[in-house]
Amino acid sequence: MAHKKAGGSSRNGRDSEGRRLGVKKFGDEQVIAGNIIIRQRGTKVKPGANVGVGRDHTIFALVDGRVKFSRKAEGRVHVSVEPLPLAAE
């Protein structure tokens, strides 16, 4: 015969997985068109030249080039892509 009362069960112990947000390509890194530069919720970082914005505010490169981050007068960070110069053949 058991001499222990039944223990209660906890209702805690769950957590959701991280969303993998953040900067994927940093300043001066080379990107090819279509590369994701930043995954974000809302437009924390604003789009600049040669970048597109996805439905979920993901910023991605529209052209091959180098990533450039800049801080504008209003204090917002903008990201753009400087196109690579065409190689002389």
Curated annotation (Swiss-Prot):
GO biological-process terms attached to the record: translation
Gene (UniProt): rpmA
PROSITE patterns according to UniProt: RIBOSOMAL_L27
Record has Ribonucleoprotein as a keyword: yes
Keyword terms, alphabetized: Ribonucleoprotein, Ribosomal protein
UniProt-listed HAMAP family: Ribosomal_bL27
Source organism of this protein record: Acidiphilium cryptum (strain JF-5)
GO molecular function: structural constituent of ribosome
Family to which this protein belongs: Belongs to the bacterial ribosomal protein bL27 family.
PANTHER family assigned: LARGE RIBOSOMAL SUBUNIT PROTEIN BL27M, RIBOSOMAL PROTEIN L27
Protein name: Large ribosomal subunit protein bL27
Biased composition (Basic and acidic residues): 12-22
Region annotation (Disordered) ranges: 1-22
Pfam family membership, one: Ribosomal_L27
GO cellular component, one term: cytosolic large ribosomal subunit
